[in-house]
Amino acid sequence: MSEEPAPKRRGATAFMRSSARDSGRSTARFDPHTAHAARICNFWLGGKDHFPADREVGEEVMRLRPQIVAGVRANRCFLRRVVRHLASRGVRQFLDIGTGIPVLGSTHEIAQEADPRSRVVYVDNDSMVLAHARALLASGPEGSCDYLDADLHDTGYLLREASRTLDFSQPVAVLLLAVLQLIPDDGNPGGLVTELANALAPASYIAISHMTADFAPGPVAAATAAYNAAAAVPVTARTHAQITAMFGGLSPLAPGVVPITVWRPDIADSLPQPADLYGGVARTVARRW
């Protein structure tokens, strides 16, 4: 993208500051007694925003599959590499769906290192994540970042609200990192990806990371069962073929859909243990209306 697209439906001064918009539609009810994915991941990342229920599940999963911590950290490294690579291709707008509790090295920080004018919209539907949004939203004055309380299942609403900050007539990178595993097969995760892709301009991108049991079927199955027995939203591990199919008719960039630790790795991201996730990035060609 050679030029910064004009803001839509907001004055220029609105982009000089960050904001958190609560739709009042879909925020998950706060329940500290039931383990939640965002808080469990925060525990695995060494954060402080979790409760005993989250730690209990997190510790049991770690006992059954110790590599989970390396995998969660590898997913953050994957995020960083994806955003940097797409920024190098000229992308200046990012839609990060299922962002989770804010951590250092978030999407807007990485994108605005490449170009301070970059715009980012974070999407989640968890009340604790929403409560932390203002701490996350510290955009530089030349760019913008916003937080949207929305559910991936309602792609129409999500895209309409995101268009307050992002110009969908220009390239946008949609990040779906470790979020589609929270959607069961009957929720049609691949169909949701297609709906998002169809709304994007040519030269936009879809990035996906997703858990798998391909590398250690027994331990991952046991860890998944323990997690699903206690967590608010269960997860589904999928095969390489199933995850690749989520890209629909889009062609992933080289090296394809691969273990996330080998997707354009940096030396600093080298990990001694494999991560139980595949990842890939695909480019849109043309709108499909």
Please name every model-derived segment:
Residues 179-182, 211-215:
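Short "lid" loop at the C-terminus of a central beta-strand within the Rossmann-like core
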Residues 146-148, 172-176, 192-193, 199-211:
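Conserved beta-strand signature within the Rossmann-like core of class I S-adenosyl-L-methionine
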Residues 152-153, 162-190, 196:
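A short SAM/SAH-binding and catalytic strip from SAM-dependent methyltransferases
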Residues 234-257:
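Short alpha-helix
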Residues 256-289:
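Core SAM-dependent methyltransferase catalytic element
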Residues 167, 201, 248:
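Short conserved AdoMet
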Residues 1-150, 155-156, 160-168, 276:
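Rossmann-like AdoMet
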Residues 217-232:
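Short, glycine-/aromatic-enriched active-site segment of Class I SAM-dependent methyltransferases
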